[in-house]
Amino acid sequence: MTDGPLNDSVLRVGDGRALAYAEWGDAHGSPVLFIHGSPHSRIWCPDAEITARAGVRLIIPDRPGFGRSDPQIGHTLDSWAADVEELAEALGLDRFGIVGWSAGGVYVAACAATIPERLTAAGIVSNRTMALYNLGERPHALDELDDEGRHVLDLVRELGLEEAAKTHAAEEEEYVRGLV
């Protein structure tokens, strides 16, 4: 039985900030970075036992300002990708998979756009980004996005995830209505 992480550490990135991370699963398994949602942190492992049996070395960094990671004033999604690259270098990872849960999804999209040569695979699970910008109900919602948000939205569309997000949102809404 896995009682805790294999490793729970802090890396000092180039600008001196603390980037905390924990490793779960199989220490010699295939490396996969898991980008947590909000308000989670590195200590939330989806299922450490299953992760280990699957032969996965799951590395969960705390996003800036979460857990033991320092906040980063003026951070961008591209600067997050740079942090991920520094973490990969420190852990000796040439290539790795990456998956984002919920609010972690946009961070994965940024890594896919910025450091694709480092990634073996990228996945976004249960992300509500598209649902937040329901253009039918909020026609001026795109005006609220900054350049970075537009970049991520363009990437979501380019990857064909927009329709999947709409489908997921509709299924989720139907499920919630069934509970009420």
Language-model segments: residues:
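Conserved acidic catalytic loop of the alpha/beta-hydrolase fold
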Residues: 79-97
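Alpha/beta-hydrolase-fold enzymes
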Residues: 120-180
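Conserved hydrolase catalytic core segment
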Residues: 94-137
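Conserved HGGG/HGGXW glycine-rich cap/lid loop of the alpha/beta-hydrolase fold
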Residues: 15-70
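Short glycine-enriched, charge-decorated loop/helix-capping segments at active-site entrances
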Residues: 71-76
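Hydrophobic/aromatic ligand-binding patch that stacks against planar heteroaromatic rings
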Residues: 50, 87, 110-111
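N-terminal cap/lid segment of alpha/beta-hydrolase-fold proteins
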Residues: 1-23
